[in-house]
From Swiss-Prot:
Keyword terms: ATP-binding, Isoprene biosynthesis, Kinase, Nucleotide-binding, Transferase
Organism, as annotated: Rhodopseudomonas palustris (strain HaA2)
EC number(s) given by UniProt: 2.7.1.148
UniProt record similarity statement: Belongs to the GHMP kinase family. IspE subfamily.
Enzyme class: transferase
Protein name: 4-diphosphocytidyl-2-C-methyl-D-erythritol kinase
Top-rank taxon, per record: Bacteria
Pathway terms, separated by semicolons: Isoprenoid biosynthesis; isopentenyl diphosphate biosynthesis via DXP pathway; isopentenyl diphosphate from 1-deoxy-D-xylulose 5-phosphate: step 3/6
Enzymatic reactions: 4-CDP-2-C-methyl-D-erythritol + ATP = 4-CDP-2-C-methyl-D-erythritol 2-phosphate + ADP + H(+)
InterPro entries: GHMP_kinase_C_dom, GHMP_kinase_C_sf, GHMP_kinase_N_dom, IspE, Ribosomal_Su5_D2-typ_SF, Ribsml_uS5_D2-typ_fold_subgr
One GO biological process term: isopentenyl diphosphate biosynthetic process, methylerythritol 4-phosphate pathway
GO molecular function, one term: ATP binding
Residues that bind ATP: P98, V99, A100, A101, G102, I103, G104, G105, G106, S107, A108
Residues annotated as the enzyme's active site: K13, D140
Amino acid sequence: MPTTALSDQARAKVNLTLRVVGRRVDGYHDLESVVAFADCADRLTLHPGAELSLVTSGPGAQDCGDTADNLVLKATRLLAERVPKLRSGAFVLDKHLPVAAGIGGGSADAAAALRLLARANDLAADDPRVVEAARLTGADVPVCLPSRPCVMTGVGDTLTPLPLPRLPAVMVNPRVPVATKDVFKALGLRAGQLNVGIVDVLKSKGWPAVDASVADWIVAVRRGTNDLEAPALKVEPIVGDVLRALAALPGVRMSRMSGSGATCFALFASDEDTKAGAEVLRAAHPGWWIHAGSLS
């Protein structure tokens, strides 16, 4: 078992599409979402063998809230309940991603913790006990565990891999937190109620093949939607400002909100267009969090 410090990235999750199929009788929502992961991330380090603890640092540390409630510790305790004599340790979280932002920052951190704990205890990352701990930690943690592009269905626990190419993208967050529960409340589905558009989900076409181009994928993603965009606009109207700013960029191919917001993204045909678009946004909105990179 490793005795030296272990480190891993916690990449931002982006919902390229997000359909809310309906609300189940248990109150959870069934979803269908094409998920990709960005090249921006938090970084989590584990010092194995020390007493379980978490220290946050980095530019986003002040937004993490009470350390005792952090999903890194929740995931660790859930795995410890399933793995006798689990070797944990001291975690250090270098926080860069915005919180309550629709990009699964806390979930990605928890997934990174589970991957590090698996390495520290000679477990496979897809060990059923690790996967179960991920599911119980939070709805976005299972998809963040492998952090690979996929179609996510059910309550986020059924993952079908997708051959997604590298998509040049700009991500923007206005530094305004949006609570997921408030957005789903604004959506207003009753328990057992199907959402408008269920027929579209059931009849949806397959996604591009393994050798499809970036242009083919952008066309396919553009045909989709995010059913949480409209309720998120009711909760926090600044989401509309972000979407309008992205849609106005030169060379933009499409723009959409991720998750329950407020982070939005825009896809481009080239890295050059992506970088140019980000510079335009930084000049116009110096207070926003802006990342120029890619999704894959």
